Amino acid sequence: MSQNHILPQNSITNAVLEWNESGTPVSNDFDDVYFSNDNGLEETRYVFLQQNHLPQRWQEYDQRRFVIGETGFGTGLNFLAVWQWFKEFRSQYPDAPLKELHFVSFEKFPVTKSDLIKAHQAWPELAQFAEQLQEHYPAAVPDCHRLVLEDGMITLDLWFGDIKDCMPQIWMDDKGLIDAWFLDGFAPSKNPEMWNQTLFNNMASLAKKGCTCATFTAAGFVRRGLIEAGFDMKKVKGFGHKREMIAGTLTERTTKANHEVWYARSTKENITDVAIIGGGVASAALATTLIRRGVKVSVYCKDEKSAQGASGNKQGAVYPLLNEKFNSLSRFFAPGFIFARQFIDQAAKHVEFDHDWCGVTQLKWDEKSANKLNKMLEGNFPNELVSSFDIDKTNQMVGLPINMESVHYSLGGWLCPKQLTRGLFEHLSNNPLFTLHCDSEIIALTQNEEQQWLLSTDSNAYQHQAVVVANGHRFTDFEQTKDIPATPVRGQVSHIPTTESLKNLKTVLCYDGYLTPENSKHQTHCIGASYDRRDLDLAFKESDQIENGERLRKCVPNEVWPNDVDTSDNQARVGIRCASRDHLPFIGNVVRFEEMQEEYKNIYKKRHWLREAKDIPVYEGLFCMLTLGSRGLSSAPLLAEALASQIMGDPIPLPNSVLEGLHPGRLWVRRLLKGKPLDI
């Protein structure tokens, strides 16, 4: 397909490759090789690692995480090579301050996984690294895909899309993010669209002061463009038969932060100690990613055991929430779901929990649902993420007669949230950095003169540098978070015995409710769930139990097997979800509501007001991770990764425009921008 062929923004076009007589992949679009026919690995090491003074710089580096930016991912050769060298460095210098390598790369036309595997056969010495990359290589969905490898020692942010669109979407503060640039890609003569002043300026914008840069080309316009952007560039000897290449350093940073002040995100310097309030899957995911970064984590759970709230169900469906628009909803949930699969699969290597990647089938059970799902399919997502099924295919996939059309999420499935949450906490308990406080209900948050947070129970007070409120609908317990515009939603899920017909259900079935396949260990299914806004009653309701069964029979009215669903033994579980008006979570700094209301009262007079605009007022060191709703299993892992990245000052794996859609102050800001009162 031509590189100029324009598709909807939810779609990314895979590269079309041919293989030359040397077995090297060649791009059809650019008529250029992905790496040198001769000694491609050695060329990578010379051009990009050695000319960026690696690994020597790592020995002298005094920060926790070193960040490399790359302009063309291709087959991942540069990434694999630097991964190999960094792992050797960590082995040789285990006590060095530098613990983690973060690699940020861009690719407009990602190679397919099968082509990736074939290309990697050229470098057998990199096989152990290549296999891990292949295992978690993402579907062709736009924006950032985070891969966490080597238990957090290696992080890859792989941005799918045009680099000129992606680079400005990376959240950045005044200090910049990148320590070294690998300016790679097809030759400037083959890909002139990429090699331009916009690229060079964006590289400088994302770079820290002292950031180095190296590229294989010695083209004069590239050297002049990088110098104009602020890099001090020099010619150096090229690799092998190539006479010259260029390398250099950014001597001064002039670029400022790249986000609106009312969507600012801040953190405290050198955070080493974080408290998390809440005992569910959100807290478990966040604790996991913070511990990987060497942070001391204390989780406070009000119940005798974790996962007693909304994360306590026996079976929960895992699939993305998508729409046809290229907006915050799809742009978060598509990569969020892909990352959730990675997180859960990695957890399964050391945590035991019931789960089955059997797929999720969503029925077009009436005209409204059919219109909604057909509209969603116009988003042109890859089939690997979601596909359309006719009646025959639906019946075949479900394993029971349905006789209606559907959409199918082949990567989806179900898992036991309670087992996953408790298993993650149990695994973390082996780490001296982690403490789980059960039976510890926090009743108040206060900040002392040293800007430390005090968490008070009835009998104790605990002091921490930073706090994350992740306690679902109980966010109203605290003065600082009580005004967040979120709604509690009661849900009752029924546990039903399997039958000869229900045993045939092969996939999670979604309609105006959901039914899971049998958990063979217990010979039961879950069917649900009721949805009662602002209802906090945790008592069992027989009417909800009956309704859970009737909802399936209403949506699949012409088949016999739904009559086998028997909820009469009243086995059920009630939980309270927490939801936002726009169906997106809140993650980030907790906003000082009254101060923001006063500071931003004239925000709608934007032109005049912006002259004196200040960052949105927040509680320093106080964060939230709330309103995951009924999609917490699909969203919590990436939300945790994004929030941990913000807290620790790492690159954030979400576009700026999506981060705006997740900001805890967004609903207030939107009203103020329109000159409306804050009555939400």
From Swiss-Prot:
Q: Which UniProt keywords apply?
A: Cytoplasm, FAD, Flavoprotein, Methyltransferase, Multifunctional enzyme, Oxidoreductase, S-adenosyl-L-methionine, Transferase, tRNA processing
* UniProt EC number: 2.1.1.61, 1.5.-.-
One GO molecular function term of this record is: flavin adenine dinucleotide binding
Query: Predominant location of this chain?
Result: cytoplasm
Among the record's GO biological process terms, what is one?
Answer: tRNA wobble uridine modification
Cofactor(s) listed? FAD
**Subcellular location, in the record's words?**
Cytoplasm
* Region of interest: FAD-dependent cmnm(5)s(2)U34 oxidoreductase: 277-680
What the entry lists under InterPro entries is as follows: FAD-dep_OxRdtase, FAD/NAD-bd_sf, MnmC-like_methylTransf, SAM-dependent_MTases_sf, tRNA_MAMT_biosynth_bifunc_MnmC, tRNA_MNMC2, tRNA_S-uridine_synth_MnmC_C
Stretches for region tRNA (mnm(5)s(2)U34)-methyltransferase: 1-251
From the UniProt record, list the reaction(s) this protein catalyses. Answer: 5-aminomethyl-2-thiouridine(34) in tRNA + S-adenosyl-L-methionine = 5-methylaminomethyl-2-thiouridine(34) in tRNA + S-adenosyl-L-homocysteine + H(+)
Taxonomically, which superkingdom?
Bacteria
Where is coiled-coil annotated? Answer: none
Listed GO CC annotations:
cytoplasm
Q: What family does the database annotate?
A: In the N-terminal section; belongs to the methyltransferase superfamily. tRNA (mnm(5)s(2)U34)-methyltransferase family. In the C-terminal section; belongs to the DAO family.
Function (record text) = Catalyzes the last two steps in the biosynthesis of 5-methylaminomethyl-2-thiouridine (mnm(5)s(2)U) at the wobble position (U34) in tRNA. Catalyzes the FAD-dependent demodification of cmnm(5)s(2)U34 to nm(5)s(2)U34, followed by the transfer of a methyl group from S-adenosyl-L-methionine to nm(5)s(2)U34, to form mnm(5)s(2)U34.
Q: What's the protein called, per UniProt?
A: tRNA 5-methylaminomethyl-2-thiouridine biosynthesis bifunctional protein MnmC
Please report the organism this UniProt entry assigns to the protein. Answer: Aliivibrio fischeri (strain ATCC 700601 / ES114)
Lineage of producing organism: Bacteria, Pseudomonadati, Pseudomonadota, Gammaproteobacteria, Vibrionales
This chain is encoded by the gene named mnmC
